[in-house]
Amino acid sequence: MYNLSSIIRRKSTRIYVGKVPIGENAPISVQSMTNTKTTDVAATVAQIKALQSVGADIVRVSVPTMEAAEAFNQIKQQASVPLVADIHFDYRIALKVAEYGVDCLRINPGNIGSELRIRDVVASARHHGIPIRIGINGGSLEKDIQEKYKEPTPEALLESAMRQVSFLERLNFDQFKISVKASDVFLAIHSYRLLATRIDQPLHLGITEAGGARSGSIKSAIGLGILLSEGIGDTLRISLAADPTEEIKAGFDILKSLRIRSRGINFIACPTCSRQEFDVIGTVNALEKRLEDIVTPMDVSIIGCVVNGPGEALVSTLGVTGARNKSGFFEEGERKGRLDNQQIIDQLEAKIRAKAALLDKKNRIQINQL
């Protein structure tokens, strides 16, 4: 497929969350966060595995209490994906999970306490060889910054971020990434743009509290899409009030749309009209659900008639062009036969799986190639 993309990634330093590289032109990693009670070890482990099954590179787990920290110890032993511990208010929890082998600590300067406490967290991170994510959020800025700016502004988020960066620099600690999240799309965009010009550490992208699955995905796609198209961002999370697996799917969809990183099938489908010769919407919905396990990147066009079908099939890995009773099937732009419209879902699924097996290029981050 013709690609007009000319994204030049912002230069950044590299850190590792577990074995996943972040920054310095590493593939943009996609992460999510569990929403189970962390003290429910079985439920949390099950959700981590579900997230991993749809492509999560990193999973964040909230650790609000010492009891949750003890549960985290058990969870970490059962997880094969890198885990980030989300810490607020009590810095001692960060020290405890560091002992338990956490892969990254996420702290919020607005509520973690004094610089002395942050100093202790940094010392622990250094000792255990783990990075820190500094999470700046428009809804929880430090009190003096709130009083100065009266409301969240890009300058307020930047000041909060640079305060922490300067402190970490004084401690000679450079193993960190940083985020400046806001629920307002423009506030987030401008905050990240400002920060990107001031530091070279990796940036964690996100629109915080974006909303439900539909509206939140759209807000995140607009905000993160603009930043990513400008080369800003090294890892991302799509924050949705929905099943966390939807965050991973949305994250990959955004990266896929910008041709930055692909995972699984990119379906190209018409919105349908009276010319469609088979149920396009039902076919696409069924195949998206059936083929969630496919990680091989490929473009599959499903067009209900001959107006645009042949043209889309020409530039797709596989394509279907609607025709009466039997629709045309294309592979790599060449017509390869016809599919029975009554059996089109089963037949197309088989074709896609066969092609995926042939290509066999799993698009996960390959550590040994970086």
Curated annotation (Swiss-Prot):
Instruction: List the PANTHER family hit by this protein, alphabetically.
Output: 4-HYDROXY-3-METHYLBUT-2-EN-1-YL DIPHOSPHATE SYNTHASE, 4-HYDROXY-3-METHYLBUT-2-EN-1-YL DIPHOSPHATE SYNTHASE (FERREDOXIN), CHLOROPLASTIC
Q: Which keywords does the record carry?
A: 4Fe-4S, Iron, Iron-sulfur, Isoprene biosynthesis, Metal-binding, Oxidoreductase
Annotated GO biological processes are:
isopentenyl diphosphate biosynthetic process, methylerythritol 4-phosphate pathway; terpenoid biosynthetic process
Q: What is this protein called?
A: 4-hydroxy-3-methylbut-2-en-1-yl diphosphate synthase (flavodoxin)
**Gene behind this chain?**
ispG
GO MF terms, alphabetically ordered: 4 iron, 4 sulfur cluster binding; 4-hydroxy-3-methylbut-2-en-1-yl diphosphate synthase activity (ferredoxin); 4-hydroxy-3-methylbut-2-enyl-diphosphate synthase activity (flavodoxin); iron ion binding
The record's annotation in InterPro entries points to: Dihydropteroate_synth-like_sf, Enolase-like_C_sf, IspG_bac, IspG_bac-typ, NO2/SO3_Rdtase_4Fe4S_sf
Query: Where in this chain does the entry annotate a coiled-coil region?
Result: none
> This protein's superkingdom?
Bacteria
What does this gene product do? Converts 2C-methyl-D-erythritol 2,4-cyclodiphosphate (ME-2,4cPP) into 1-hydroxy-2-methyl-2-(E)-butenyl 4-diphosphate.
Q: Per UniProt, where does [4Fe-4S] cluster bind?
A: C270, C273, C305, E312
Q: Which cofactor does it need?
A: [4Fe-4S] cluster
Q: Return any one Pfam family short name.
A: GcpE
Originating organism: Hamiltonella defensa subsp. Acyrthosiphon pisum (strain 5AT)
Supply the EC number(s).
1.17.7.3
Catalysis: reaction(s): (2E)-4-hydroxy-3-methylbut-2-enyl diphosphate + oxidized [flavodoxin] + H2O + 2 H(+) = 2-C-methyl-D-erythritol 2,4-cyclic diphosphate + reduced [flavodoxin]
Q: What is the lineage of its organism?
A: Bacteria, Pseudomonadati, Pseudomonadota, Gammaproteobacteria, Enterobacterales
Q: Which family does it belong to?
A: Belongs to the IspG family.
Which pathway is this protein assigned to? Isoprenoid biosynthesis; isopentenyl diphosphate biosynthesis via DXP pathway; isopentenyl diphosphate from 1-deoxy-D-xylulose 5-phosphate: step 5/6
Q: Does the keyword Plastid apply?
A: no
